[in-house]
Amino acid sequence: MARTTAINRYRNIGICAHVDAGKTTTTERILFYTGLSHKMGEVHDGAATTDWMVQEQERGITITSAAVTTFWKGSRGQYDNYRVNVIDTPGHVDFTIEVERSLRVLDGAVVVFCGTSGVEPQSETVWRQANKYGVPRVVYVNKMDRAGANFLRVVGQIKNRLGHTPVPVQLAIGSEDNFQGQVDLIKMKAIYWNDDDKGTTYREEEIPADMVELANEWRNNMVEAAAEATEELMNKYLEEGELSVEEIKAGLRARTLASEIVPAVCGSSFKNKGVPLVLDAVIDFLPAPTEIPAIKGIHPDLIDVPKDEVKPEQFDERHADDDEPFSALAFKIATDPFVGTLTFVRVYSGFLTSGDSVINSVKGKKERVGRMVQMHANQREEIKEVRAGDIAALIGMKDVTTGDTLCNADKPIILERMDFPEPVISLSVEPKTKQDQEKMGIALGKLAQEDPSFRVKTDEETGQTIISGMGELHLDILVDRMKREFNVEANIGKPQVSYREKITKSNVEIEGKFVRQSGGRGQFGHCWVRFSEPDVDDKGNITEGLVFSNEVVGGVIPKEYIPAIQKGIEEQMKNGVVAGYPLIGLKAAVFDGSYHDVDSNEMAFKIAASMATKQLAQKGGGVVLEPIMKVEVVTPEDYLGDVMGDLNRRRGLVQGMDESVSGRVVRAEVPLGEMFGYATDVRSMSQGRASYSMEFSKYAEAPSNIVEALVKKQG
């Protein structure tokens, strides 16, 4: 089957923004104008097509990135048919993992700002992530009908706060209740939208007299920006003082793809004024899959080599071409009530037909592709093949998680792995009834497969199920999904910190002896173990787990009991020696002991080793470690004092400060135990203008007052 749309007419784009900039409404309008969706969904009614989870509709926020395939021929039918794959991304800080995951597979982005509130903290986070992946973007200033909306003010904020060069290609005609349309600076015409067809068509008129001067000024700014693309255009502009419409578009496009500028448009999605021109801007200024750098990857043999040690010549490249070997990245897993697991993939090279077998090169497993569907929000269309540049969902994948690569078995490659941050907050969840117990296990397993930043484990001592994630809202929503999608009722505990323990002395020799001999068959286990603190590398990372060695000579302990001694030490490590938290690492050598011909058995030696390990609290200088987070707070200068004072109160150590376009960036290391509720506190301290990000840095010794409280709690 031949390709239906040429690859240079593909646009893989994301709609990115902070909460409430009107991103979902904008996506809805895109679906409407591209002819797929006949009734516009409104977020207020909880009916938007891309917000397809019940929680999203209730909270009016977007959680999952739904990928939607649409087609666009231009607001005036001026193009051949373009295929636009739209990925809707969430805007809440706890879901930055979703945004990051989407940006990874996009070629370009439309960043939506609110005409009234402009650049907000979360938009700075999204902007930084887009910079990290080098995503070219177009800015759409939405909600121009709102009180206090001002297009040029937001353009100024993008320049000053985000440090990018926005180039308006439109101006707003009127604002607030009087917002009527746009001035198209490329054609130098005024555009007014028809309400009868919900803003599908528009009429062009002359620019209002009171705007001509402003329009000329901003047009010159735009033409100059376009002329700087090449020497040729610059020379023509200097000689003739003007460029043709085609030259302006070509110049702006080249500079947008190089991430030197961002074209800016405006409108009101809710009032149906302007979205078709946003789509035109996507076609005019954002890249096709063939215009972005080839994706790099490594051979599966190099999977264990640290990223920074892979030599440049060891990287493999895949170009967006049907003739190259097949490669695709799984960027999202979703559970669908009707078909089971959907694996969303972005195809980078080659093609795949349903029924083909591929390998998951990260896990080294073979997968057979059953059915393939292309999603239109929550409806789906079955397709027979996917080609380079496509985004589709595969059904029937057995063991694929987010970030895995699917490829040809004879040309394996691992595309760049996404870095998922370690979860920092944990809660205990307990099923309310026996029936819920089994369902909860299945539900948590599925949710963990969908979301790599969410982990599940069982606390061996209490038997409780512990879930960990990226923030309080993140876990709230997962618990909520468990209730709704899987009908599991659960009781939720308070947020907990994951503490660890370690010893601080080396070459400590401890005897463990377990004897029970009171008639009949007894128990006898006796060992001497030399314990040492774990090794630490030059970056301060502790060697985790047990490093065990057997130095017994002369058969004083028979060989078959040595594994039991190792097991006894490992089990006691899990339960800790000071306050009941796992030992992070330990070196142990068994070097002496004795046994009894009749009474010795594996169990006795296991208990003896465990008893020896328990004594480490006193004899080995046992300490409790707490997780230390690397915290970055971006705050306007006015609130710097408050933010610094607050970090000190939280036992934070300020590591340094930088200037940034968004204000001051404070870098600090703060114990996680002091960071609960910080999202709310930092917002109220700075009237919502400061934003922060936090990731795990290291484990460090906890102060004595914390340790005392923990020991007391363990009783």
From Swiss-Prot:
Compartments where found: Cytoplasm
GO cellular component: cytoplasm
Highest taxon of source: Bacteria
Residue numbers binding GTP: 17-24, 88-92, 142-145
PROSITE patterns found in the cross-reference section: G_TR_1, G_TR_2
Keyword set, alphabetical order: Cytoplasm, Elongation factor, GTP-binding, Nucleotide-binding, Protein biosynthesis
Disulfide bonds: none
Chief localization: cytoplasm
SUPFAM superfamilies in the record: EF-G C-terminal domain-like, P-loop containing nucleoside triphosphate hydrolases, Ribosomal protein S5 domain 2-like, Translation proteins
Gene Ontology molecular function: GTP binding; GTPase activity; guanosine tetraphosphate binding; translation elongation factor activity
GO annotation, biological process: ribosome disassembly
InterPro entries: EFG_II, EFG_III, EFG_III/V, EFG_IV, EFG_V, EFG_V-like, EFTu-like_2, G_TR_CS
Domain tr-type G: 8-290
Family (UniProt): Belongs to the TRAFAC class translation factor GTPase superfamily. Classic translation factor GTPase family. EF-G/EF-2 subfamily.
Functional summary from the UniProt entry: Catalyzes the GTP-dependent ribosomal translocation step during translation elongation. During this step, the ribosome changes from the pre-translocational (PRE) to the post-translocational (POST) state as the newly formed A-site-bound peptidyl-tRNA and P-site-bound deacylated tRNA move to the P and E sites, respectively. Catalyzes the coordinated movement of the two tRNA molecules, the mRNA and conformational changes in the ribosome.
Designated name of the protein: Elongation factor G 1
Gene: fusA
